[in-house]
Structure formats: structure tokens, C-alpha cells
Amino acid sequence: MALQAATSFLPSALSARKEGAAKDSAFFGVRLADGLKLDATSLGLRTKRVNTSSVAIRAQAAAVSAPTATPASPAGKKTVRTGNAIITGASSGLGLATAKALAESGKWHVIMACRDYLKTARAARAAGMPKGSYTIVHLDLASLDSVRQFVKNVRQLDMPIDVVVCNAAVYQPTAKEPSFTADGFEMSVGVNHLGHFLLARELLEDLKASDYPSKRLIIVGSITGNTNTLAGNVPPKANLGDLRGLAAGLNGVGSAAMIDGAEFDGAKAYKDSKVCNMLTMQEFHRRYHEETGVTFASLYPGCIATTGLFREHIPLFRLLFPPFQKYITKGYVSEEEAGKRLAQVVSEPSLTKSGVYWSWNKNSASFENQLSEEASDTEKARKVWELSEKLVGLA
């Protein structure tokens, strides 16, 4: 299963504080951008918000100015400038592995979009990501206001946005009752689909304005939402039905918490959200590829059986699932390998085809995979798009 690590959805430990000509502060070897000040309390680290116009947080030694084009070579030709890629959920798992692979290439600056600054800063240092190769900006996909603020903060960096990777996800397979986002949506669909939908729509103009040779929007999919596969047929199967739950708001009060209007099932909610992700990618392609030149793609990088996304599963599952994938199904891939595969979809010239769902064979070669009938239903994609626009306030 192409499952991505997702962090807990508690409020962030950081918020921005505007102080005029504030000086940079150092904390655990990480520099905070202008406008941030930390207070230590018995409960941990906090900031006090004075002005809601927050600014982005920079990694240690990262320059505030955007990467620029490389000067002309002796032959008189300009080389391609460093690309800038936003990755959601980059503090662990697939997101962190992808951020590391891109940063280590020397060709990319990574904007790590995460809820917890300190966790992300420590993870980047532990992974050995080069100093100056990344910027950490707060994003909580369980809040549409946070998504909008993130877009404002990223634009304050004055960097062109060349690639957006929608990777973060929440998975609650053992939950008996639904939990909800700040906006009242069932958590899995609210974070995995609606939060990313708003983010991608808001950043589309930035991608369109990019002068990078190959600008891309990538939404991580999952084999579990693809019912034309063996894994996709493991109960409960993904099924969006007639979208009656989505149309009613997924709030579990005046409507069902599930997209199809059925009773809540945490595992199915995740799978349904991944179907929405794959439908959304295709609808982006149909609506905007020709106009913008942006490549829209999804992928299944392989089964990352050790990912932290399984932390809410029962202990026996967490114990047995990795060896089962390694030795029985042979579908296991490490976080490092999966990160390299996602980095390929970000940067490889051979993977520029738009509207594609990428997978890898046993020889680690990429290929265009087929989607199930539901995950490729153009009419359902249109309906999901239009309902999502209303739910996130774009229509």
C-alpha cells in the first residue's frame, strides 16, 4: 500500500510574532526567520501571536532570497536554476525521504510544509540534508485557514514555485468513531483530499507563473484505492457511491461522515480519500494542463510497510506487515527507495507526461499504471471537483 507518513493533528508548537525589525533567533542550532520568538514553558515550546500575518521559518543558514539562475557558462548559455519544490508531510516517511533525495541532488531547494517546526528541523538535520537546501513553513492541512496562511507565507519567500507534492496523509484504521478537522470535515478526507485540493488550487497560479522547464503538481495515490488490484480488493473496498456524504459536508452531524453516506469506517475513509486524490489529479490535467503547461501526475511508489502512517494500527499488524510485504508479496520498498521514486516524478525529464499514474515494477523501472473504473471515472471526477470547490470556499 502506498501509504505516506502523517503527523498527529495537534496545534503547532509555533506561531509567528511580528516585531518590526526583529533579529533572527537561534534555537537548537536552527535559525528562525524574522518575526519569530520562542518562549519556553513547562508544557513545552510556544510562541505568542501578536500579528496573524506570519512569516515563513527558514532552516539554518538558508538564505532569505530565492535561488537564482546560474550565471552564463563560458559557452554563453545559461544553465537551469535551482528548482523549488513544496512537499507536504516532509517531516517523516516518504515526504522526508523525498526531500532528502531532492536536496542531496544539488538541483532543488525544498520547502518542507509541516505542522511541527521543531520535529521537522530535527528530522532534516538527522537525515543529513545540506544546510541551505530547505525551508520549513508551517502547514496544518486539517485547517483551511492554515492552508491559506501557508500560501501567503510561501509567497513572502519571494521564490518561484516549480513543483508541488501533495504527500501528507492521515490514516485511522482502528478508529471506531470519526474525528473532524477544524472546518468540520471527517479527518481522512478533510486532510488527505480537501486540504490538498485547496492548497493545489491556490498554488496553481504560482506554478503557472514559474519559468522552470518542467513545472509539476504531484498527488500521491495509493494501491488501496485502486480496486483493479489485489490490494485494492481487500475489505473494506474504496467506494465513493453517489457522493451523498461529500455533498452534505461530511460533518457527521447533519450528514454522514463518509463520502458514500455509509457508516464510518476508518480504513475505508482513507481509501476513499485516495480515490479522490487520483480523480483530482486527472481533473487538474483535463482542466489546466494545456492552458498552463503544468504536468499533473499521481503515483504509487510501492508498499512502505515501515512507515509511521501505520502507528494507529494494532501492534500485531505493525509487527507482521513488514515481513509479509518483504517475503510474501515482494511488494516492500524502503522509505529511502520510495523517496527516490517520488523524486523521479518530481524531476526526471522522462516522467513529464501529464495525467499519468506512475508505478514501478520489480526491476524498479517506472511505468504508466492503470486505474480502476471508479478512480478514472471522468463524470465522478467532475462531481468531486465541484463539490470540493464548494466545501473549501472556492465556489
UniProtKB/Swiss-Prot annotation:
Pfam families: adh_short. Residues 1-59 form a transit peptide. Gene3D superfamilies: NAD(P)-binding Rossmann-like Domain. It comes from the Eukaryota. Keywords: Chlorophyll biosynthesis, Chloroplast, NADP, Oxidoreductase, Photosynthesis, Plastid, Transit peptide. Coiled coil: none annotated. Signal peptide: none annotated. The keyword Transit peptide applies. It is an enzyme of class 1 (oxidoreductase). Its EC number is 1.3.1.33. Pathway: Porphyrin-containing compound metabolism; chlorophyll biosynthesis. GO terms for cellular component: chloroplast. It is found in: Plastid, Chloroplast. GO terms for molecular function: protochlorophyllide reductase activity. GO terms for biological process: chlorophyll biosynthetic process; photosynthesis. NCBIfam families: LPOR. Phototransformation of protochlorophyllide (Pchlide) to chlorophyllide (Chlide). Belongs to the short-chain dehydrogenases/reductases (SDR) family. POR subfamily. PANTHER family: PROTOCHLOROPHYLLIDE REDUCTASE C, CHLOROPLASTIC (PTHR44419:SF20). This is Protochlorophyllide reductase B, chloroplastic. It comes from Hordeum vulgare. The gene is PORB.
